[in-house]
């Protein structure tokens, strides 16, 4: 997209749970329709992308950011970090649980700005971890561009069907001593 509108990245709070849910469900459907079984997508979105799920993550200390565009701060992407839920996590790691962008805005400055916000917030952690579907080449390329490397694999359930994911990590620069 060459003509990107005025945009911003801002930290999201519990009051943004509906926007996180909407973007999470829309991007999951957009990314995996025709790849993952339709009923599985619906079940996954109902459970994993509900506003209640986002409120619960935020209440437990997760942090999220929204990418918004004008007019009216329309949500087009988001990222969320939380305490690691991945088996390959070590003490001091942080998990990039989700980073999603509507396809119209993928490959624009918004996606990189969203990742920069996440990396800045992760300062002081040892590594930033994430899981990604093993054949999602576009996402794998984006993560490689941002310093992530494959450290292992996991199985990921979507609506009762299991898929293979890569687990990626980015080593973070320690926070400066004060």
Say what each PLM segment does:
Residues 162-171:
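Accessory recognition modules or surfaces
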Residues 112, 135-152, 161-163:
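Conserved active-site alpha-helix within GNAT-family acetyltransferase domains
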Residues 3-7, 11-17, 22-106, 112-121, ...:
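Acetyl-CoA-dependent GNAT
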Residues 122-132:
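Conserved GNAT acetyl-CoA-binding A-motif
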């Amino acid at each position: 997209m060459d003509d990107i509108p005025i945009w911003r990245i801002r930290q999201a709070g519990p009051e943004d749970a509906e926007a996180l849910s909407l973007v999470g469900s829309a991007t999951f459907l957009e990314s995996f329709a025709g790849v993952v079984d339709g009923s599985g997508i619906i079940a996954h979105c109902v459970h994993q992308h509900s506003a209640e799920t986002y409120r619960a993550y935020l209440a437990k200390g997760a942090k999220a950011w929204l990418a918004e565009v004008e007019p009216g701060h329309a949500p087009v992407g988001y990222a969320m970090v939380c305490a690691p839920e991945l088996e390959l996590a070590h003490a001091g790691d942080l998990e990039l649980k989700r980073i999603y962008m509507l396809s119209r805005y993928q490959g624009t400055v918004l996606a990189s700005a969203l990742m920069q916000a996440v990396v800045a917030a992760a300062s002081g952690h040892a590594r930033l971890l994430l899981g990604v579907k093993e054949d999602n080449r576009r996402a794998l390329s984006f993560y490689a561009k941002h310093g992530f490397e494959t450290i292992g694999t996991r199985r990921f359930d979507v609506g009762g069907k299991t898929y293979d994911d890569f687990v990626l990590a980015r080593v973070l620069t320690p926070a400066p001593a004060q």
